[in-house]
């Protein structure tokens, strides 16, 4: 957020020496790294990940938001001091990704593979992931591709599909991370072993226990799984 400087790459199509089409894309020179047990690094320096999740949904409008509503949400996100946003659980407006490039927010983008498994979603999930990556590849704000959220059994099928999605993401974009979100509360579930990062959803103070109980739980995860890159 301190200095989200962007360059511009201008691609021109020429015919007989004249420009007949032109596309301008953002170029942000940055390096993301996550080190297990230590945290997130931006351009080689430790960077705080103060995050929120954002849904593209307003009362009375549903998902059919204008840029005015997108800007309102982003203003609230900036005002609370967030440095990173998860756009869940689906591809959101192209305008949002572009605004996050200019604001210096670090983005988690994902496909709508959530909770339930039918056994028939493989082709659709791969198509949506491929399209998400190809459409959003040039946004420097995006650091990770989300493959699924709290997807439950059948475990063997879901683990295999997650591996194929991870492989697809690495083929399309070998330099960004992948993540799958775990709703089980422990880090060794087979469904969540096939991505670079493991997201952990557990809602202390909401569905169970107290907010303060998250600290010993996280410390236990770090002790038991020191090699895991974890996001909460």
Predicted regions and their residues:
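Substrate-binding/catalytic cleft of secreted carbohydrate-active enzymes
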Residues: 74-75, 84-232
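Secreted/periplasmic carbohydrate-active enzymes, especially glycoside hydrolases
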Residues: 1-91, 97-99, 103-107, 128, ...
């Amino acid at each position: 957020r301190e200095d989200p400087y962007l360059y511009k790459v201008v691609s021109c199509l020429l015919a007989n020496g004249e420009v007949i089409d032109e596309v301008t894309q953002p170029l942000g020179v940055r390096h993301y790294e996550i080190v297990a047990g230590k945290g997130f690094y931006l351009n080689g320096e430790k960077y705080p990940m103060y995050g929120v999740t954002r849904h593209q949904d307003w009362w009375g409008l549903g998902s059919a938001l204008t840029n005015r509503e997108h800007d309102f949400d982003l203003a609230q996100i900036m005002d609370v001091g967030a440095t990173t946003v998860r756009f869940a659980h689906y591809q959101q407006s192209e305008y949002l990704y572009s605004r996050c490039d200019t604001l210096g927010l670090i983005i988690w983008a994902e496909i709508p593979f959530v909770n339930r498994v039918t056994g028939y979603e493989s082709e659709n999930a791969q198509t949506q992931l491929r399209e998400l990556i190809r459409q959003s590849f040039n946004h420097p704000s995006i650091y990770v591709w989300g493959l699924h959220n709290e997807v439950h059994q059948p475990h063997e099928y879901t683990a295999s599909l997650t591996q194929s999605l991870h492989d697809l993401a690495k083929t399309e974009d070998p330099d960004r991370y992948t993540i799958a979100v775990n709703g089980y509360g422990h880090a060794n579930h087979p469904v969540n072993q096939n991505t670079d990062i493991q997201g952990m959803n557990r809602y202390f103070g909401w569905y169970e226990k107290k907010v303060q109980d998250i600290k010993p739980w996280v410390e236990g995860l770090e002790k038991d799984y020191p090699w895991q890159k974890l996001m909460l």
